[in-house]
């Protein structure tokens, strides 16, 4: 043997280790299925985005409702148009499985991927993970906030928002009766403060093209695939809290 092939290495970093320098350029935070965000974490992510030219890619189960949320499925599913969202110097992956595949398509396009998770388990759906941060998400973002005093730079978010708004404006008002038509018509009409339970694949993917009111939360049994138990989860949640609307 004259040559050893390169091996893809993943650096494991804990809260006690020296943090790597944050790459300069366009940074995307990719949020998979996620529990309700605390106000502290939301604020930390918002400030991080402002300091580092960041944007937050979401689907209906991400539950981040801060300032820089973009419904990235509409950007990721384009065959004849390459969105600015594809051009990322760093993608930071938080949360669990993402069932909106059109959004997942953006992940391999980043130059490098970092993951942050308090369970420390390596998850690498894009096969491009370079660093795994074993810590709470808020500790990760607060570290980089404390280390910087940058002026606001939101050019990447503004470009992604402009792309999304442009593509949304091109959607035909005569969508055939379908799951996508239902999502298009109903998503802005969901009552404030309610909770949506999406069946995986068809419903979740259809609804993730569109935005819902800011106080709406969304969930889906994204680990199921097949018979996902969506109705069971919906009924159980509605019985737990009878003061909230569930759909």
Segment roles from a protein language model:
Residues 24-38, 171-175, 200:
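Active-site donor-nucleotide binding/catalytic segment of nucleotide-sugar enzymes
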Residues 31-114, 214-243:
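Glycine-rich, anion-gripping cofactor-binding loops and their flanking helix/strand elements
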Residues 16-22, 81-83, 186-188:
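Short boundary motifs at domain starts and secondary-structure transition points
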Residues 26-28, 89-92, 195, 245-247:
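Structural motif
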